[in-house]
């Protein structure tokens, strides 16, 4: 095996069904250094650009400004959500590691669903880790965060962000890559909400009403 091409010979290090505990290190230009880091990659915006055969000078890859094309951010002043995403990951990881379901601070119905999705030996399609993590993030923010100091800080941040964008519509977005099964995550969210709403009709945390908007290019 060529030590200079380790990344290209084995680019995938983790199982899609398990916690991503390793990653390939990338340099400032988004190129692989051929070094494996024994921990999860932090959330960040990376756009790997193929290295040209001839390069006169070394340039650092310029960050992309994410402002939905509205000109709301510039290179000098831009909105960067990655710090709070990484912070949320930390708290969800810590919560996930709690062994006793009675200490999860969720409803018994939610606890049973989590145990099923995390540990059931599915005979057909098994949920990917990223699908379960997306659901866990929504559950943690809804059921756990209101009872913790760190959680309340997240909720305040989300409320302020929503007030700046659209004060009349509280929104929470979950971003998953193409092919990771976003439709399945929507179904899991609906199941979680519906079961709890039926058992707790007076709770404002859960609902039985859903609006599903889908593009016409999904097959």
Feature map (PLM): residue ranges:
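N-terminal accessory nucleic-acid engagement/regulatory domains that precede
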Residues: 1-124
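Conserved Walker A/P-loop ATP-binding site and its immediately adjacent core
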Residues: 185, 204-219
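Generic beta-strand/beta-sheet core signal
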Residues: 175-177, 213
């Amino acid at each position: 095996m060529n030590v200079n091409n380790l990344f290209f010979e084995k680019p995938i290090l983790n199982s899609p069904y398990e916690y991503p505990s390793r990653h390939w290190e990338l340099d400032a230009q988004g190129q692989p250094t051929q070094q494996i880091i024994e921990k999860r990659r932090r959330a960040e915006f990376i756009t790997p650009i193929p290295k040209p055969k001839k390069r006169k000078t070394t340039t650092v890859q310029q960050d992309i400004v994410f402002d939905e094309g509205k000109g709301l951010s510039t290179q000098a002043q831009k909105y960067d959500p990655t710090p709070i995403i990484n912070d949320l990951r930390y708290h969800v990881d810590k919560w996930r590691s709690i062994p006793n379901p009675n200490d999860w601070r969720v409803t018994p119905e939610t606890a049973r669903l989590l145990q099923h999705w995390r540990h059931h030996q599915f005979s057909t399609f098994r949920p990917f880790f990223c699908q379960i993590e997306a659901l866990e993030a929504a559950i943690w923010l809804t059921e756990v965060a209101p009872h913790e100091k760190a959680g309340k800080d997240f909720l305040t941040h989300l409320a302020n962000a929503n007030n700046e964008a659209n004060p009349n519509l509280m929104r929470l977005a979950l971003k998953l890559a193409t092919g990771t099964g976003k439709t399945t995550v929507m179904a899991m969210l609906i199941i979680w909400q519906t079961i709890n709403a039926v058992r707790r009709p007076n709770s404002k945390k859960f609902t039985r009403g859903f609006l599903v908007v889908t593009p016409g290019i999904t097959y």
